[in-house]
């Protein structure tokens, strides 16, 4: 798989920014079929950094409704990537 097919988008939240500042860990939404090795390789190729560790979580869908219409959000996979000391991803800086 191409790195841009594996990494869907960065997760922008208060918790993810705390992880960046305190732990040097970056959070991404990734393809549900991707494993940790593929995610590691994709992040290293896309951002030119060295990845030390990858943790993944399957985020379950939640029920939602709008008026009488009921539905569910999509199930997605989240990857928390820890980088080597001194490495940073500029995409997250200054937001």
Curated annotation (Swiss-Prot):
GO function term, MF aspect, one? rRNA binding
The UniProt entry's GO biological process terms, in alphabetical order, are:
translation
Keywords in alphabetical order, please: Ribonucleoprotein, Ribosomal protein, RNA-binding, rRNA-binding
Could you tell me which InterPro entries the record lists for this protein?
Answer: Nucleotide-bd_a/b_plait_sf, Ribosomal_uL23-like, Ribosomal_uL23/eL15/eS24_sf, Ribosomal_uL23_CS
Q: Name one GO cellular component term.
A: ribosome
Q: What does this protein do?
A: One of the early assembly proteins it binds 23S rRNA. One of the proteins that surrounds the polypeptide exit tunnel on the outside of the ribosome. Forms the main docking site for trigger factor binding to the ribosome.
State how it assembles: Part of the 50S ribosomal subunit. Contacts protein L29, and trigger factor when it is bound to the ribosome.
Q: Which family does it belong to?
A: Belongs to the universal ribosomal protein uL23 family.
Identify this protein by name. Large ribosomal subunit protein uL23
Q: Give the organism, scientific name.
A: Rubrobacter xylanophilus (strain DSM 9941 / JCM 11954 / NBRC 16129 / PRD-1)
Q: Which gene encodes it?
A: rplW
């Amino acid at each position: 798989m191409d790195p841009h097919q594996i990494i869907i988008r960065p997760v922008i939240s208060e918790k993810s920014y705390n992880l960046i500042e305190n732990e040097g860990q970056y959070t991404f939404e990734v393809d549900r079929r991707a494993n940790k090795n593929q995610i590691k390789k994709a992040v290293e190729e896309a951002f030119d950094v060295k990845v030390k560790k990858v943790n993944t979580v399957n985020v379950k869908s939640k029920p939602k409704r709008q008026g009488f219409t009921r539905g569910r959000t999509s199930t997605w996979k989240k990857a928390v990537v820890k980088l080597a000391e001194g490495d940073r991803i500029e995409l997250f800086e200054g937001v």
